[in-house]
């Protein structure tokens, strides 16, 4: 199985041209993914002989290419995209050829599964985890969700109110202590207020007014959650100087075939597979 990528930045038109060019010598499935991490996850999981991964270099490109593919009647394409917060609004995209990840993005889908337990077994310290959970009164997973949600609420707020905040300035590494694995919410809110031209009380009011009481993980974002987890593993629940790239890699490995087959996205892709000219999975 090849993983197609161009050196220049892609556009929907370039992606479709790439698929057409490959179709001259390849009669299998062109599987659209958003980026490099998605490609790394799916490469060992789709068929090595009848499917090729197309890295679209971003969600806008993937959705734009999918719209063009449907207009042109190209029938050899399927794909997966991150729904982000769109699921809260009931928004879906091109269900005839695409399926969303189970949670807001692929990383979050992996974290919300039993792959998290495998990662904690590998990189966490059992005694420290037990002590942390005893003191907090919740599991590591529940604490991770509650902490990452607070970053996600601000992402949601920025999106719906068009605050255009640079979230590189709001990295969990700045606001979550590696020593205690606690969030300095006051500092986080103050920084968001500074970046959006608001006051901290205004931000708190907007969070209460506009952010829904959504189920677990629905207001979290994968990169934030991975960074929060990496901070905890460095001292409070482990003793590993582990990077977010390491966390993401181990989660991909730990997400077993059994976990994949239990996922909604897998069942949706299996359903789409019946319309494709070749097998997506081996």
Residues covered by each model-derived region:
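Acidic, divalent-metal-binding catalytic cores of TOPRIM
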Residues: 1-282
């Amino acid at each position: 199985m090849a993983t197609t990528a161009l050196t220049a930045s892609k556009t929907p038109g370039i992606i479709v041209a790439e698929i057409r060019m490959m179709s001259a010598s390849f009669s299998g499935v062109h599987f659209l993914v958003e980026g490099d991490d998605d490609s790394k996850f799916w490469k060992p999981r789709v068929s090595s002989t009848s499917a090729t991964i197309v890295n679209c270099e971003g969600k806008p490109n993937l959705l734009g290419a999918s719209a063009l593919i449907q207009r042109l009647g190209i029938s050899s394409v399927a794909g997966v995209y991150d729904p982000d917060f769109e699921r809260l609004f009931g928004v879906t995209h091109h269900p005839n050829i695409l399926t969303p990840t189970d949670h807001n993005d692929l990383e979050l889908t992996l974290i919300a599964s039993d792959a998290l337990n495998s990662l904690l077994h590998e990189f966490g310290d059992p005694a420290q985890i037990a002590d942390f959970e005893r003191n907090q009164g919740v599991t590591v997973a529940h604490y991770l969700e509650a902490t990452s949600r607070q970053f996600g609420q601000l992402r949601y707020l920025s999106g719906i109110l068009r605050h255009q905040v640079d979230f590189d300035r709001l990295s969990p590494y700045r606001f979550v202590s590696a020593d205690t694995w606690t969030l300095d919410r006051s500092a986080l809110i103050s920084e968001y207020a500074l970046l959006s031209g608001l006051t901290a009380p205004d931000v708190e009011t907007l969070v209460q007014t506009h952010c829904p009481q959504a189920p677990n993980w629905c207001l979290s974002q994968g990169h934030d959650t991975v960074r929060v987890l990496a901070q905890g593993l460095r001292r409070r629940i482990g003793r590993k100087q582990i990077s977010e790239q390491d966390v993401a890699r181990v989660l991909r490995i730990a997400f077993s075939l059994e976990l994949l087959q239990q996922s909604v996205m897998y069942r949706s892709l299996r359903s789409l597979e019946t319309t494709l000219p070749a097998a997506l999975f081996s």
